[in-house]
Every structure is written in structure tokens, then in C-alpha cells.
Amino acid sequence: MTTPQVKTGLFVGLNKGHVVTRRELAPRPRSRKGKTSKRTIFIRNLIKEVAGQAPYEKRITELLKVGKDKRALKVAKRKLGTHKRAKRKREEMSSVLRKMRSGGGGATEKKK
């Protein structure tokens, strides 16, 4: 359907009807369904930092290091279930690898 047009106040024609101002309604709870809250994102990042990577994530990282992107995708798909999740995990692991190579990772720095 098309969006309703402003009523003209006339009782004949396409836009017939009484002129009213639209009420601004609060967003429905369903509109935020599936969105991750800031707190949840923070907690997940904290847990990742403390716990480290899962064994399958380490394997994906190793495969990406040697340039076996397709094999890394297959491993991720086998563990995560869907192609979409696997692609996202592969991208996440490759970004972690890039950060480590650029010196952004804390594990690569040596202490004296």
C-alpha cells in the first residue's frame, strides 16, 4: 500500500476526510529485537579478551596464516552450521590476524 496522504478536509475526492495531526508513537519493542545492547557487546569483548580463542578459532587462524581461506571457511561452516556465520567468523579471524601483524595485539609485544 502507498503511504496515506494528508486529508483535505473535503468530504469528496481521493483525500477526503477530517484533517488530523499524526501522533508520534513510541517505538515498539519488536523494532529492537535482535539488536545487541552496548552492555552485552562490552561483556562479550571482555570474555574474549580473558578466555582467548576456542580451538577451532585457532585452527581457522592458522589456516588463514598459510593462505588456505577456503579450507578455513569449510572448518568454520562445519563448526558454526551456516555459510553466513562461517563467512562472518572467517572475516573476524582475518581481522584479528591483521591486528596481530600490524602490532596491535598485546601478545606480540615483548617485555624487557
UniProtKB/Swiss-Prot annotation:
Where are the compositionally biased (Basic residues) regions? Answer: 79-88
- Ranges of Gly residues compositional bias? 102-112
Q: Which GO terms describe its cellular component?
A: cytosol; cytosolic large ribosomal subunit; cytosolic ribosome; plant-type vacuole
Asked if the keyword Ribosomal protein belongs to this entry, the reply reads: yes
Which keywords has UniProt assigned to this entry? Ribonucleoprotein, Ribosomal protein
Domain of life of the native organism: Eukaryota
Q: Which GO terms describe its biological process?
A: translation
Gene Ontology molecular-function annotations: structural constituent of ribosome
Entry keyword Acetylation? no
Note down the stretches annotated as region Disordered. Answer: 79-112
Mind telling me which PANTHER family this protein's record contains?
60S RIBOSOMAL PROTEIN L36 (PTHR10114)
Family named by the database record: Belongs to the eukaryotic ribosomal protein eL36 family.
Name of the protein in its database record: Large ribosomal subunit protein eL36y
User: Which source organism?
Assistant: Arabidopsis thaliana (Mouse-ear cress)
Q: What is the lineage of its organism?
A: Eukaryota, Viridiplantae, Streptophyta, Embryophyta, Tracheophyta
Encoding gene (name): RPL36B
